[in-house]
Structures are given as C-alpha cells and as structure tokens.
Amino acid sequence: MLPPKHCNINLTGPIPRWDEAIPLGNGILGSLFWGPMEHLRISVDIAGLWLRRRPEEKLDKEFTYAKLVELARKGDVAETRRIFDTPYARPTPTKIPAGHLFLDGLPRGSYQASLDLGTAVTSFSQKGTTILRAFLCMGRPVGVLMLPEAYRGATLTVERPSFGNGTQATEAGNSVSPGSLQQLALPDAIPETEDGMIGFSQKGDDRTAYTLLCKKCGTTLYYTAVQAENVEKASRLAKLELCAAEDMGAEKLLQQHKRWWQQYWGKSSLQLPDETLEQLWYRANYFLAAGSEPGNAPMPLQGGWCADDDRLPPWKGDYHNDLNTQFTYCHYLTANHPEQGKVFLDYLWSLRPQAAKFARAFYGTAGECLPSVMDIDGGALGGWPMYSLSPTNQIWLCQMFYEYYRLTGDKEFLRTRVEPYFTATAACLEELLQEGPDGKLVLPVSSSPEIHDDEAASWLTPNSNYDLALLHYLFHTLVQIEYQLGNPRGYWHAIESKLAPLSVDTETGLMLSPDETLQETHRHFSHAMAIEPLCMLRYENPQDRSVIDATVDHLVHLGSGQWVGFSFGWMALLQIARSNGNGALYELHRFAEHFLSRNGFHLNGDYKNSGVCDFHYRPFTLEADFLAAHAVQKMLLRSEKNHIEVLPACPQGWKNEPVAFQNLRAENGLLISYQRTADSKHSLTVKATQDGSWYLCNTHCWVTLQAGQTQSYQWTEEEKK
C-alpha cells in the first residue's frame, strides 16, 4: 500500500535553505533540490564519500584508556581535553559533499515542489503546469531530470564544492559546526568534457577520488557521481553509468524505479486516526530506503544528504555510537525492512579487524571495541572522552545484532554473527572490569552520556546506571545466546552475578550512579537505558513498575528545557513502556511541530523559538526521525518473550477510531496485520516466516505455526470482555 498523499512533501518555492530542500535518495546518491526555479540548485552527495586523511601529528601517544583513567582520577580536565577532545577540532577525517548542479532556463517566480513518497519522484510546477520531474534511479548512481518540450533550452552546469587549497584563512569551527570547506586543502578539480558530458573529477586523498558528470539529451538530463580509489577509475565508471542510462532511456529507468518503490512500500503499511503520526512513519521509511542501500555505506548523522552551505557537515557527518547510529537503525525491523537496516550490521562486521586493533591499542585488552565517535573506517575522531571513548557503547552496538536475530529468527545469523560479536565485545569488557571492596565488578571510570558535559563531574562513581545496564545486558544476553545455540556453560552468568543491581532512588527512580540522582533537565536519558531501549525492566512486574513510574515522572517534572529533538521520541518510548499512549502521543506531536524542517528533516533544536527547549540552533541529524517512527510502531505492537500484543499504548482519543497496520514484524519473524473498525470490530492475522509458537495477548491464546502459515482471528469489544 502506497503512502497516503498527506505524507508527501509539498513545498512552496523558492526554497531558501539546503536543510529545507526536496530530498531524493537511493542509498548510493543523495540530492537536494532547492533555490529559485530559474537557477535551481541540485546538491549531490555520495554515500561513503569521506576525506580519510589524518593530520601528520595523528593522535597523541598518550591517547590511551590508561591515561584517560589516570587523568579522570586526578580531575585534570585541561589535559583530558588536550589529549582526547582536541583531535575532533581538526577538519579531517570528515564526510564531504560531492558538488552541485545548476539547472538554468526555467521560469522565474514562485513554484510548487512536491515529492511523491510512493514513487520517489519529485515534480516542480507553476500554476498547475509541471515544469520538471526528477528521480534518482534505485540501484544506479544516476539522477534523471525530465522537462517538457517548452523548456528544451534549459541548461545544466556542474560546480565542485568550495574546497580550499590550504592557503586561505578560515574561521575556527566547533563540534556542531566544524567550519568552512576552505579548511580542506584539495587539488584543483579536473574538468571533464567528452561526448556531450560535462563535469569534473576530484582527487581527495590517497584513497578518495570521485567524478560528477551530467549530460543533456533533448528534454532529458542525466547526472551521476561515482567514487573510486583514483581519478582515472572514477571518471571511467561515471562515463559508463551515463552512457548506460542514456541507452536505457528515461521512461524505462522510471518504470524500473517505480517498480522498486512499489515493492518496498508493499512490505508494510499503517492507517492511523492521526495524520501527524502517519507522516512521521512514512517519511522515516522513505528516508531509510533513500539513505541505506545494501552494498553501500550506512547512513551517518545526516543520512543520505550532506550539508550544502560551503561548510563541513554538522559533527563532520560522522558515526556517533553513543546514541545516533543506534537510533538511526532502530525502527527498520518492525517496519519489515530488514535489508535496509542490515547495511549497518554488515558495516560493523566489516570493521571487526579495526575493532580488535582499537581494543588492543587503546584499551590494552583482547576482544573488540570500536570508538564511540568514529570515521567511516572505524578510526577514533576524539571528542568528549567520557562518551566518545566509553567502552560500554560497544554493547549498544551488540544489541543491534541481537535485535536483528530476535525479530527475524535467523538462527544462522545468531550463530555466525551475533554470538561472535557479543563474545568479542565481552572479552574486551571483561578485562576492563575490576573487583571492588564488596566483590562487585566495576569499571575503572564510569560516565553517563552526556551528563555534566566534559567537566570533572562527568566522571561518575562506578558503575553508572548507563554502564551497569549495558553490562547486565551484555552478559545476560550471552547466557541466552548459549541456551539458544544449545551450548550453556555458565561462564557468563557467573560474571553477571558479580555486577551490582541498578541504583534506584525511591523518589526519582533510576539514578545516574550509586551516589547521584538526576537533578536537572537533560537531553540524554542515559540513566534510563534499562527501560528503553534495553527493555530490561517490565511494567507488569510490580517492583519494576514503581521504578519505571518514578523515573519517567521525575523526567517529566524536570521538564524539557535541556532536551533536543531525539529526547522527545525517547520520552515517547518511556511513556509507552508504561502503556501511556496519551503521553507518547503528546511527545511525538511536540517533536513533529517544533523540531522538523518543512521537508521532514530533524533539526535538533527548537529552531522556531517556540519555547519547548533552550536549544535554538538547527543542525540537521536524521536519527530522531527514525526514533519517532520506532515509537509509533511501539504504540501499535509489543513483542517481548514471544508474547505479542497489539495496541499496547493506545491513546484515549483513538478508542473509537479505526486503526490498522499491515505486516509489522514481531519476534521470530512473525508478521502481524491488524484492523479495528469504528464500531470496534477487531481482526488479526499472523503470518510466520519461521517455525515457532507465540502467545497472542489480545486473544489470550497460543498459536503454533510453520514458516509460511497464517492464522486469523476476529473479535468484538463485547467478546473481549
């Protein structure tokens, strides 16, 4: 089922900013359409296009965990910043834009720009007349612009980004806005003109080069961007792509493109009595496919779209593993798009040699651990070390592997991917843990992202609830994995038994650490990991219920002053954990109203100055879009310990409204379709993709199915009573 029309992106132009642009993407290329119609700008990004080079001085020789522990215990903030945070201020490594095109010769004046999510085709029109249609071919690094005959004379030009040559004076940047592209000393671009093609090839560093080309064929214009190890290869491949596109023709490319998207949208759908939540969900699913294509680089902070404002992207467009990557890839499984999300898991798996190298070089341990702020090769970028170099963030990456198994039921993946990844991570963490005076295991230093920023107070008394929840999750899940693979040993259980329980205050719930409670509003609910996303505490357990209620109530009491965009989706999840659909709906509406650009991009701060938080900047990051979609799904479907419940957090206002969804994925690959009519008739269909048994909470029965089998149920409210 295609997305409803109200989920399309409809804008009135001229569009003044790149972060409000019409976003096209295919997981290989990303393009942003913006500016005045007569000089339409098309920003072009290539997935995985990075300048990888590191400064000659590289990382300080004291860039080690042992040194970090020493400085933390001394309270030496200045030296900690010098060694561990300063590297992030260097301009490279960084994600970079590929360039932009300018389409000239179209009429002046205001216009209507529309992106049809169902087909991923954008159209620009004036007074009801379509002037331009454009799409990025799924499966090919090719964009197509289609003009009516009246605008055959329109022209396309290509410009490279405003990279510097290393001689210009540039302003100092910061982590949010790292400064001008002029900081990047790159050689001049090589012009490309051959067989009607125009563009350029750009050498980046010893491992990076790319070519951006376009060609006009009557009323159709094609463009491509290809990266390779060297300029010669990039140029050759780009020319081959354009020739192949021209040979196939725009209409055939469009037919293939539309078929791909029709199949994609057929994987899952939903119909809600709330257009805002529908829009959040469908747009997030569009952004997922537009930014994450099997065989290509996974989405960094900005997904498939790099900044096009002559500056480095916010936070360098890097991979933040202390929340951002995990939230970016949190909703895809329930949405039944495992292929798009597995891109990130394949990427993490490919980085295992780097993770082992970093564990040895930085932590001085066996096993594997990636830095929490890293470049595309898994190299440490630096940053606040309490979080950018926290070893427990690696466990959150482990959870992503287990979630893939949990929601697909793929036992081979469990054996060949999940178990080795968990075991290698545990080998690193086990060496870092030390036995305290009470016999409990603690880390040498502990923190809770991003509490107390990078001040001395950010080092909490070990173990913080953030670290502790993740450690419990790691060793407890390893026990489960061994049982699931038929090889229980008891080793991991013995380690978990030496971890202290979570620190709890009767008034405020989960604490930051054994001796500190959260006293002020804060964006990162890291102390509440045990509730969401680790789901270790269960609301049906009376003891857990009191902890969950106290924790969430305390966060509400402290207010949203220091929240950012992702905080609202996270709070929605915390409300869902206690079946508070009204609370979840409230937070998701606040997020949608105050933190989204008009094209659906999450801009992180209250950029409209509405008063919902104290941050009024607008750096674009995409993880909060996916987190909001995840919350929408959790309102509709709960799947834990093979117990399936539909509408576990239904808002009061939906009680007499139609609600439906199709093929949302539950545990062990069970696909759930559900419908409730306005007169409260319910229908539920479950389809197994793996053999298994599940308990259906709404019908109070177990169902046992073989792969491919389905079972349907109908009931009314009276029958339910």
Each PLM stretch: what is its role?
Residues K67, K252, Q256-W260, L272-Q279, ...:
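Extracytoplasmic/secreted proteins, especially bacterial periplasmic and envelope-associated proteins
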Residues I22, Q279, Y319-Q326, N336, ...:
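Aromatic- and histidine-enriched alpha-helix N-cap/loop-to-helix transition segments
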